[in-house]
Amino acid sequence: MNKKIRALIAVGGTGGHVFPGINLASNLIKKNYNVTIVTDKRGYKFFKETDKKNVLVFPSSPLIKKNVVLLIFSLSLILYSILRSLIFLSYNRPSIIFGMGGYASFPICIAAAILRIKFIIYENNLIIGRANKKLLPFAERILVSNKKLEGISSKYNFKTVQVGNIIKREIINFSLDLRIEKKELKILVLGGSQAAKIFAEILPKIFKKCSDLGISIKII
């Protein structure tokens, strides 16, 4: 029996980072990887109870520059999280680490760089996030959803690999039975947690317009 490859996935605290991480973990597990996920308290709430046994919660914070007190506090928390990550990785060294973006992924990836553990970062936005931008010089590769990623130097182009959005296998294996023509418009809606305004204000107007035009719609 083949020995499982150990992989660690570090995800930020919003849905835009967590769900691609969950989808990546699902795919790696199917390929016989032993997967552990690290996130913060914000990200932890997105996981199902059955999945939480493989999820670790580390403290995290962005670098807050509003005043000296907050700067010192946030910097101390980041340094503590890096130290904790160093200790964890020293005793639980994975073969590969994936950083999915967000400041909660930063300490693990910095610790990986110090310990010379290979890590790959993933960016699903059009503009690279601050954490990923800081990590890019140390990363083996950066996986991107859009080929024309903004905010990175051309000297890192060789590290860029376009993979698209990491979505659920259920969407990839979309059943042909659901595509049978029934004179209805099927709309697939995808979005992160910060797309709430679009979901709440724009999409309802679009759906109402379809209804006014007599178009039957099905939202997936």
Which residues make up each language-model segment?
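An amphipathic, basic-hydrophobic alpha-helix
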Residues: 67-96, 114
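Donor-nucleotide binding loops and adjacent catalytic segments primarily
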Residues: 38, 43-51, 175-220
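An aromatic- and histidine-rich active-site surface loop
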Residues: 42-46, 94-115
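Active-site-proximal region of nucleotide-activated glycan assembly enzymes
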Residues: 3, 34, 53-54, 113-174
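Conserved nucleotide-sugar phosphate-binding/catalytic loop shared by glycosyltransferases and other
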Residues: 6-12, 29-74, 163
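Gly/Ala-rich phosphate-binding loop of Rossmann-like dinucleotide-binding domains
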Residues: 25, 29, 113, 136, ...
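A short, glycine/small-residue-rich beta-strand->loop->alpha-helix junction that serves as a flexible
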Residues: 9-22, 197
